[in-house]
């Protein structure tokens, strides 16, 4: 997957070096690994979502990481001051969390307290209700019948070059680069 922005576009929130390793090496390795595992697996023509919901072992892990990273890298834009959602998504934050600020606080807390490696997700259910989940390793909310909308990667490779062991600082900074138009389209 090609980035929709130049690697330095997310600075200072995510450095060009982190993008080079995270997208250029980690994600590329998952793609290469999955391609090597697919032949003869029965999943050759399946979508990533289908693979993530049905596969096990290495196929699941690599497909899950590809799907997670596609959603992750696809949600960013250059840093923006006062970056906030609008429309139906903003209304859903108010309905399901009390306010956008309350949502952000809970989301960051879930990301900061996830033990080990994984992802914190905002997803919608079939009725449009918003949910925050912690998913370990390569798991994705599609496995629970949810529609993934927004994710923060809490694997150390996502932030360690820029933030070292300060995961909460990384999570707090990510709000500046969320492209809410992308998230709103996913929610629609």
Regions found by a protein language model. Name each.
Residues 1-188:
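Feature for soluble, non-membrane regions of globular proteins
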């Amino acid at each position: 997957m090609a980035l929709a922005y130049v690697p330095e576009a997310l600075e200072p929130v995510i450095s060009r070096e982190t993008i080079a390793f995270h997208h250029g090496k980690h994600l590329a390795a998952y793609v290469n690994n999955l391609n090597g595992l697919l032949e003869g697996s029965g999943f050759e023509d399946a979508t990533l979502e289908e693979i993530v919901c049905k596969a096990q072992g290495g196929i699941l892990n690599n497909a899950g990481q590809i799907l997670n990273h596609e959603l992750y890298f696809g949600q960013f834009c250059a840093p923006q001051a006062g970056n906030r959602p609008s429309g139906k998504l903003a209304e859903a934050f108010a309905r399901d969390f009390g306010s956008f600020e309350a949502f952000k606080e809970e989301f960051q807390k879930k990301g900061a307290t996830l033990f080990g490696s994984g992802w914190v997700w905002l997803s919608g259910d079939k009725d449009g209700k918003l949910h925050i989940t912690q998913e370990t390793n390569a798991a994705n909310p599609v496995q629970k019948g949810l529609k993934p909308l927004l994710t923060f990667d809490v694997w150390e490779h996502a932030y360690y070059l820029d933030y070292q062991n300060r995961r909460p600082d990384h999570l707090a900074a990510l709000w500046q680069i969320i492209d809410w138009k992308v998230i709103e389209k996913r929610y629609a």
